[in-house]
Amino acid sequence: MTIATGAAVASNYYPQPLLDSIATDLGVSYAAVGIIVTVSQVGYGVGLMFLVPLGDKFEKRRLIVLMMALTAAGLLISGLAPSLPWLLLGTAMTGLFSAVTQVLVPFAALMAPVNAKGRAVGMLMSGLLIGILLGRTVSGGLSSLGSWRIVYFVAAAVLILLAVMLWRSLPTHRSETRIIYNELIGSVVRLFKTEPILRQRALLGFLSFVLFALFWTPLAFLLSQPPYQYSEAVIGLFGLAGIAGALAANWAGRMTDRGKNREATLISLVLLLVAWLPLGLGKTSLAALIIGVIVLDLAAQLLHVSNMGAVMRINPELRNRLNSGYMTVYFLGGASGSFAAATIYQYFGWDGIVTAGVLVALVGLVFGGRAVYRTRAGG
């Protein structure tokens, strides 16, 4: 399940090291090609809102395998795309059905013992982050063997293989919920009205993913220009610098199980601000850029798992819907950050990205610091 989670979410991040090549091949601007990242995040957010709650209604194994197969179909459309609109169509389809990751996470929590649910979530969150980061690395490496299109074809084949493996290995599980679909979706919206912890954690998740996307979306542009002028394969290797964040996922899961969620949240909010200090020097310093990547990814993952731990404890019977609500807002943050990053970099360069990052991180620290002490979010 961890591997499937990573492979599915990676589908949304393969384009990032390839943006410069895609822009050149399709004859579009940086701002236009940056829409690819935005569309993938919006598609993922729509899937989280309208598809993930189905895990509380339908048999989970069948739903997971179907969504994996449709994600692969979206990748094939992208790989065959003759123009940007076709690529955006394939990207939207991939993003929509790759939300299967958030059917897998509550399923893992459901199957885990009571005293190990935080670790189970942390394990799949590790797979999620590794997929996001290594997706860039694999993408850059594969593209060096040929066209950027080969990345999409290989990724589609991997997802089909994983879908077959999940069908053979996962247990069947049908929810006892008999609620109709419209009421199911409406209940997700109502949870935001009735659960203050969900509102607070969703906003923190939104801000953290804005920061994550602000950095990663324009990184390929920065590294493909002087003084770096790196190839796609080298740009993809920067995903390895963020692997430290995967370690934070297990650590955060264990802190949640020990009732230290609030401490993990505050540490992550401080680190999200601190990360932009070395990143501010990244325009000319490779060492500073790498340090900033490590701190930013670690902090973002630590906060994400802390948020998930708090949200999952609200009501065990509503895990899929709580997860759907939180993750929808979370990935809307990614879409907003991606859209803003492409535009900011186009007109203000790396200095504009860093300024925006510092401002968003300050908002998160002020809001989050007040919120976690006003509620017993993670206990």
Task: Describe the predicted segments one by one.
Residues 48-59, 247-261, 345:
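Helix-to-loop junctions at the C-terminal end of transmembrane segments
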Residues 171-203:
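Juxtamembrane intracellular "pre-TM" segments in multi-pass secondary transporters
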Residues 100-112, 302-315:
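Intracellular juxtamembrane helix-capping segments at the cytosolic ends
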Residues 262-307:
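C-terminal transmembrane helical hairpin of 12-TM major facilitator-type secondary transporters
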Residues 46-84:
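Conserved MFS/SLC helix-loop-helix module at the cytosolic interface between two early adjacent transmembrane helices
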Residues 90-127:
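Cytoplasmic helix-loop-helix junction between adjacent transmembrane helices
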Residues 86, 123-168:
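Helix-loop-helix hairpin linking two adjacent transmembrane segments in secondary transporters
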Residues 62-76, 263-278, 358:
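Structural signature of the two symmetry-related core transmembrane helices
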